[in-house]
């Protein structure tokens, strides 16, 4: 009898095809389900063995109780419908012990879900620019991996090099979460 398929739910974003291809390239027995507020398919998470929360729009400050920070968001790049949808996904994953990988915005919405806050605009907080370069290419920098973190146990690395394309970041870390890797200016990257 063949092994059952592993079903991974991936939240919709402009680079959904990249995320889906990445997952499908790592196993013949994997299926990807596209999850999105626009599709209104929250019920599809019931068949998912894992979830990838992808990058994308800014997380609205109301979801981390800091409405006073809305002025720092990119107004044309906020989707409260997506925020609400992904928070409902996190309610399900938390209640059902479903693993989650949060990438960029995914990390940020998860931090908000667990009671953390965000830096809404990294450069205005006195940190270096983590967005794309002026020619629209990715920016790269090093990260320091916490030696006591799960990330360090998996990778056995003290330092890494990552691409960086975000202007929001975790600030106060949510309950039960750990900042596993920091950029040289102290921005949470994992």
What is each stretch, according to the model?
Residues 1-101, 111-119, 123-161, 167, ...:
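N-terminal beta1-alpha1 cap of cysteine-dependent amidohydrolase-like domains
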Residues 104:
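Conserved G/P- and acidic residue-centered "switch" motifs that form tight phosphate/ATP-binding loops
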Residues 107-109:
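Hydrophobic, aromatic-enriched interface-forming segments
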